[in-house]
């Protein structure tokens, strides 16, 4: 049963303060909440599932009118606390049955970024992803990569794949391991821009020319990738729009507590730049 007493506060749980994608989502959320005279209560969980569950449990005790969860993965503990909540919840970035969700076309974005390199004649693709427990960034993007390979008549090869964390340093070290066991790669898909930037730095420090020796593409389209020493080809995800739509959806749920859960899927736009041999000299790299 949803409670009716209002505090005019909305809890927003985010996994990483340092993430540009999360910051863009929060910006979209904040604009809507400001317009509706709601305060935003922000909780950073530092990619810690236990802290995320604890944050949900804390907000359960009548401190907010609703919750927006920028999610990465779900555990049985997540399920238990989500089912116990008495305020409306919107999940961003993942799909979760029974709850309203705003999510990206992670499969399509990864497929398009990978296919772009294969269409340029590359035939030895590598993959730097994240844990498959993350159904969006990990699993869906991996499946998009695999699909692009199959469409090009190629077979995914496990020795050409590696799992990284959500940061540049891990991207660098996993690229080092990947190139060590699979020399001769001529293109590399990375699940996030941060991972790709680490891989780009590895290539630079080891004399691999991008894009001549190896092409690199990713998903996210963060601004730092646009101004890298070789600008990064990346599938633009509409993070700020995701935050905006999540907040508006939550406002609708507050107005109608009996509204059915909604699933909102956002599209992507592939931004082709020098890391795949494309010219982006006329692009406004500062736009969001």
Regions found by a protein language model. Give the residues of each.
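N-terminal helix-turn-helix DNA-binding module of bacterial transcription factors
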Residues: 1-9, 149, 280, 287-288
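Periplasmic-binding protein-like
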Residues: 12, 63-71, 126-129, 161, ...
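Alpha-helical structural signal in soluble globular domains
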Residues: 28-32, 78-81, 85, 140-152, ...
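Alpha-helical recognition/docking segments in bacterial nutrient-uptake
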Residues: 5-115, 119, 178-180, 184, ...
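Hinge/beta->alpha junction and helix N-cap segments in small-molecule ligand-binding domains
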Residues: 14-24, 42-51, 102-112, 128-176, ...
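Flexible loop/turn connectors
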Residues: 176-177, 181-288
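Short acidic capping loops at alpha-helix termini that bridge into adjacent secondary structure
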Residues: 124, 156-160, 210-213
């Amino acid at each position: 049963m949803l409670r009716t007493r209002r505090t005019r506060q909305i809890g927003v749980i985010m996994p990483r303060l340092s993430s540009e994608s999360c910051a863009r989502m929060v910006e979209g959320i904040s604009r809507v909440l400001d317009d509706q005279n709601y305060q935003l209560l922000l909780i950073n969980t530092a990619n810690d599932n236990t802290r995320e569950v604890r944050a949900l449990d804390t907000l359960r005790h009548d401190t907010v009118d609703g919750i927006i969860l920028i999610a990465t993965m779900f555990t049985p503990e997540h399920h238990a606390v989500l089912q116990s909540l008495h305020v409306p919840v919107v999940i961003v970035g993942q799909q979760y049955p029974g709850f309203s969700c705003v999510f990206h076309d992670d499969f399509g974005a990864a497929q398009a970024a990978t296919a772009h390199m294969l269409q340029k004649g590359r035939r030895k693709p590598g993959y730097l992803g994240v844990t498959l427990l993350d159904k969006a960034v990990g699993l869906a993007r991996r499946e998009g990569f695999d699909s692009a390979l199959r469409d090009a008549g190629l077979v995914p090869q496990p020795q050409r794949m590696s799992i990284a964390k959500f940061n540049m340093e891990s991207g660098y070290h996993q690229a080092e391991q990947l190139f060590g066991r699979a020399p001769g790669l001529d293109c590399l898909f990375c699940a996030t821009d941060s991972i790709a930037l680490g891989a780009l730095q590895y290539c630079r420090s080891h004399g691999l020319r991008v894009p001549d020796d190896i092409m690199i593409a990713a998903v996210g389209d963060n601004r730092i990738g646009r101004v890298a020493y070789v600008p990064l080809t990346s599938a633009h995800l509409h993070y700020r729009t995701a935050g905006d739509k999540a907040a508006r959806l939550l406002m609708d749920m507050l107005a109608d507590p009996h509204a059915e859960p909604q699933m909102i899927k956002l599209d992507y736009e592939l931004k082709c730049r020098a890391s795949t041999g494309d010219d982006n000299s006329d692009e406004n790299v500062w736009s969001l």
